[in-house]
Design a protein with these regions (language model features):
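A gly/Pro-rich, aromatic-decorated transmembrane alpha-helix motif that marks the paired
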Residues: 143, 147-163, 212, 216, ...
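Transmembrane-helix bundle of Major Facilitator Superfamily
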Residues: 1-185, 319-321, 328, 332-342, ...
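12-transmembrane solute porter fold
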Residues: 8-31, 227-241, 247-425, 430-463, ...
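Helix-loop interface residues and adjacent transmembrane-helix termini in multi-pass membrane transporters
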Residues: 42, 72, 95-96, 131, ...
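Flexible interhelical linker loops that connect adjacent transmembrane helices
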Residues: 2, 180-208, 250-265, 326-327, ...
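A residue-level signal for alpha-helical anchor/packing sites in multi-pass solute transporters
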Residues: 35-36, 123, 127, 158, ...
Length: 478
């Protein structure tokens, strides 16, 4: 593909609008969840959680498949298909008249998101040449990817309070249609032009089913316990299916995932580091939202507004990171971000039950925003640098899967830790005590991501990565 046949920055704007919708819908529902429970007569909180879980289940489950199929059949094509599915599902969510309908339509929305996200990242990687240009583009994409989660809390509260919970879904319809029309006009098509002897259907089925079983088990672990049948059986199924997938890939003529791609040290390191970092970072929104509602007594809209400084900090940090990474390398920039994020988690772990927003929560939010903004862009760049265009969709699918599964695993483990250190869930002081342990665990996850990055990217590996990518003028790793 000719990278200069279209204005790449127009393409980036279109991609960012689509990605914004995807990350927005991962959090926007949380603020309106109890309004939805009342309106659609959910029988219990256990059934209510499926409004969130069904989206995550299909999103995480189909990411890898969506990324690889986009490589083979056309990234733009699957980006457009994902937009259509996501937009139609959003409309159906908004007009749902029963709990079952909403859960089913949210699953469909998650499927659309799984087609959009890897295609979006791979389109950026194939549109922008390696080096400063791609670094700046990924800085913008990273700010949208992280900041959109915080905006979702604000927008969800505003729409629910001023209009109706249905508008948290309806808002996607005009945005989706406009993004679709713009993508048809401006986004160039690209795909792997090599001749293929067939498609790895068995690999596609096993990895998708395996990832869905894993996320399903994680979703039930905090509510039912790690030894519950609802948790253990999906984990066993996931282990069998994913082991079968690896075996299939070693024997397939046209594997869905060429296992040799993990020999690219930057990709392997980026995925492991992001898996661990997201295990801690994802919980930040969840437990801080609970702290704001339960300890500080904020309402839905005010809770969303409390995260606005975080959004601003992420935007600033991602911009700074995209400027620094080409000069000093992605590893030191990401390392500083991880250290700042660990500091933020430690501050959160010390918040008192009678604390105030300005003195007890805001400092951690600001430091955390600078840290997370500095992590996301360099690690994303590391995951996509030094690869052929034909592998960008696969790399994007792997990277997005690492985030989603890492986030689900981290939230499940940290929720269990919080619960085990909470004497009485109805007593705010006890709940906050549990949050402290959860944030401490989150700090450990992020610290481990730093250890993994430093340990795996040793000097000779860094030299090898830079030598492989030197022709493209890649951003230095060290």
């Amino acid at each position: 593909m000719n990278r200069h046949s279209v204005n790449p920055w127009i393409v980036l704007v279109i991609i960012c609008f689509a990605q914004f919708m995807v990350v927005l819908d991962a959090t926007i529902v949380n603020v309106a969840i109890y309004n939805i429970k009342s309106a659609l007569h959910f029988g219990s909180d256990a059934s209510l959680q499926w409004v969130v879980t069904s989206y995550t289940l299909f999103f995480a489950g189909f990411l890898l498949l969506g990324g690889r199929v986009g490589d083979l059949l056309g990234r733009k094509r699957f980006f457009l298909v994902g937009l259509v599915v996501f937009t139609v599902a959003s409309l159906l969510d908004g007009i749902a008249t029963s709990s079952g309908q909403l859960i089913a339509f949210r699953a469909l929305q998650g499927l659309g998101a799984a087609l959009i996200s890897p295609a979006a990242l791979s389109i950026i990687s194939t549109t922008f040449a390696e080096g400063k240009e791609r670094a700046r583009a990924l800085g913008v994409w990273a700010a949208i990817a992280i900041g959109g989660s915080a905006v979702g809390l604000v927008l969800g509260g505003a729409l629910t309070q001023s209009l109706s919970w249905r508008w948290i879904f309806f808002i996607n319809v005009p945005v989706g249609i406009l993004t679709l029309l713009a993508a048809v006009r401006f986004v160039p098509e690209s795909k792997d032009e090599h001749e293929h002897k067939g498609y790895d259907l068995a690999g596609a089925v096993t990895v998708t089913a395996g990832l869905m079983a894993l996320v399903y088990g994680l979703a039930h672990s905090s509510a039912h316990g790690w030894s519950s049948t609802w948790t253990v059986v999906p984990f066993i199924a996931a282990a069998i299916l994913l082991a079968a997938f690896v075996l299939i890939e070693t024997r397939s003529v046209e594997p869905l995932v060429r296992l040799s791609i993990f020999r690219v040290r930057s990709l392997l390191t980026a995925n492991l580091a992001m898996f661990l970092a997201f295990s801690g970072m994802f919980a930040m929104f969840f437990f801080n939202s609970l702290y704001i509602r339960e300890a500080l007594g904020f309402g839905a809209l005010k809770t969303g507004l409390a995260f606005l400084p975080f959004t601003g900090g992420v935007m600033v940090s991602a911009g700074i990171a995209s400027g620094l990474a080409p000069k000093i390398g992605v590893r030191p920039v990401a390392a500083v971000g991880m250290i700042l994020t660990v500091i933020a988690m430690i501050l959160f772990a010390r918040m008192p039950v009678d604390g105030s927003y300005a003195t007890d929560l805001l400092p951690g939010l600001l430091i955390g925003s600078l840290g997370m903004g500095a992590i996301f862009m360099p690690i994303t760049l590391m995951a996509t640098t030094g690869l052929k265009d034909s592998d960008q969709g696969l790399a994007s699918g792997l990277f997005n899967t690492s985030q989603q599964v890492g986030g689900a695993l981290g939230l499940a483990i940290l929720s269990t830790i919080a619960t085990s250190h909470t004497a009485n869930q109805k007593v705010v002081a006890d709940a906050v005590h549990g949050f402290h342990y959860a944030f401490a665990g989150a700090a450990v996850f992020v610290a481990l991501s730093l250890v993994v990055m430093v340990a795996l990217l040793r000097a000779h590996h860094v030299a090898q990565i830079q030598a492989e990518a030197a022709e493209g003028g890649a951003v230095p790793v060290a």
